[in-house]
């Protein structure tokens, strides 16, 4: 397993069973008063965004970067959804072109393709 920090709360996790990108954030948020430090805009997002799975923890703009998700993250990625009581996160991601979702349950282990086990 290899974990690559990609700025703020973002990371890419690579395993023999697949790859997961978590909370990718690059563009300024909150009226451009928040921005990633150090600057992560020059990372190879074409490669980093080509993943099997995407995990966005919540809709705060320093975790959910719609512009970046639209431009760089593979729409073939399966989105790992937390067990939230509303569909707002899924709705926002569907609006960006993501189509494949795995709805997780809290405190439950989920086995993904290739045998990768996760718990959200």
Language-model region placement:
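Bacterial Sec-exported substrate-binding components of ABC uptake systems
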Residues: 1-9
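Beta-strand-turn-beta hairpins that frame and shape the catalytic cleft
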Residues: 1-2, 14-20, 109-119
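Active-site environment of divalent metal-dependent phosphoester hydrolases
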Residues: 12, 28-29, 59-64, 86-89, ...
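Pre-active-site segment of Zn-dependent metallo-hydrolases
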Residues: 16-55, 59, 66-71
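A short helix->loop->beta-strand "cap" motif at the edges of active sites that frequently abuts
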Residues: 18, 74-78, 98
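Glycine/small-residue-rich loop that forms an oxyanion/phosphate-binding "nest" at active or ligand-binding sites
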Residues: 57-59, 73, 81-83, 102
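Metal-dependent catalytic neighborhoods of phosphoester/phosphodiester hydrolases
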Residues: 65-73, 88-92
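Metallo-beta-lactamase
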Residues: 82-120
């Amino acid at each position: 397993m290899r974990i690559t920090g990609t700025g703020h709360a973002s990371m890419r996790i690579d395993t023999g069973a697949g790859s997961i990108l978590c909370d990718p954030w690059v563009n300024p948020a909150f009226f451009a008063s928040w921005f990633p430090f150090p600057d992560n805009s020059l990372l190879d997002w074409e490669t980093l965004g080509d993943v099997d799975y995407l995990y966005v923890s919540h809709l705060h703009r320093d975790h959910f970067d719609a512009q970046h998700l639209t431009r760089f993250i593979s729409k073939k990625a399966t989105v790992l959804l937390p067990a939230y009581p509303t569909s707002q996160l899924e709705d926002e991601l569907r609006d960006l072109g993501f189509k494949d979702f795995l709805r997780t349950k809290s405190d439950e282990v989920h086995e993904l393709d290739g045998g990768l086990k996760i718990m959200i």
